[in-house]
């Protein structure tokens, strides 16, 4: 079993679809192998970027089975199992616990119901007490409509099956969690633009969307940090920041899929209610990524960091 302590650069991987909007496992295998070769050492499968709300129960189970086989222990694998139904979250997490190659579950703060902090504690305590696998909390208030407060995270970090958090919030909140969490509780930022700063503050790393496109650059940034080359690491983060932001200028994961499709990974379009970028949007995205205007309308090279190399 791969563990969180070994991972710093995790990709929240897209779910590729074919022209009939069925999961394309060949494309998933091609993309996964490429990301591992480039320096990714962990994955979230079936998360926000994986369009999990549009996947059926059976599709998720098959996706997780196939993905566990594809990765085959080469990186840590975290599978999304959370929902706004506590009983269903427990049931589904225990199904996923039986799948080879899935190391952890990811349980989101319940969306739509808008639980308060006491309700969140009750929900996650019930999950903790009734599941057969370790899991991470997913705190993403921009999508769930509610924020798990830092004190609540620290309280829940004491529970046996809760091994970490994907935290999409301020750096100040992350600092508090890192300072007060239980030993062995791993903290990951879910904000690409915080990748370097979060690591400096003591987080384990980042769960990233941009790493689909900039794995090599992000790995180089972390390596520079570990080698004490702080100006180089900072330069890479500055280069990445605007590009990371650009990948969210339209509803995600449509932008990252547009880039991957141009690079030949055949991830397909998003399922409704999201739509693919049109040509005008692709031109605008390309401009914000520092590419030629028509770059996403034709074949795109895999290495998009050459101007960083020449900087």
From Swiss-Prot:
Reaction equation(s) it catalyzes: L-aspartate 4-semialdehyde + pyruvate = (2S,4S)-4-hydroxy-2,3,4,5-tetrahydrodipicolinate + H2O + H(+)
Subcellular location: Cytoplasm
Annotated Gene Ontology cellular component terms: cytosol
InterPro entries: Aldolase_TIM, DapA, DapA-like, Schiff_base-form_aldolases_AS
PANTHER family in alphabetical order: 4-HYDROXY-2-OXOGLUTARATE ALDOLASE, MITOCHONDRIAL, DIHYDRODIPICOLINATE SYNTHASE
Record-listed pyruvate binding positions: 49, 207
Record-given protein name: 4-hydroxy-tetrahydrodipicolinate synthase
Family: Belongs to the DapA family.
Enzyme Commission number(s): 4.3.3.7
Native species: Lactobacillus helveticus (strain DPC 4571)
A Pfam match: DHDPS
CDD domains in alphabetical order: DHDPS
Function: Catalyzes the condensation of (S)-aspartate-beta-semialdehyde [(S)-ASA] and pyruvate to 4-hydroxy-tetrahydrodipicolinate (HTPA).
Record pathway: Amino-acid biosynthesis; L-lysine biosynthesis via DAP pathway; (S)-tetrahydrodipicolinate from L-aspartate: step 3/4
Gene, per the UniProt record: dapA
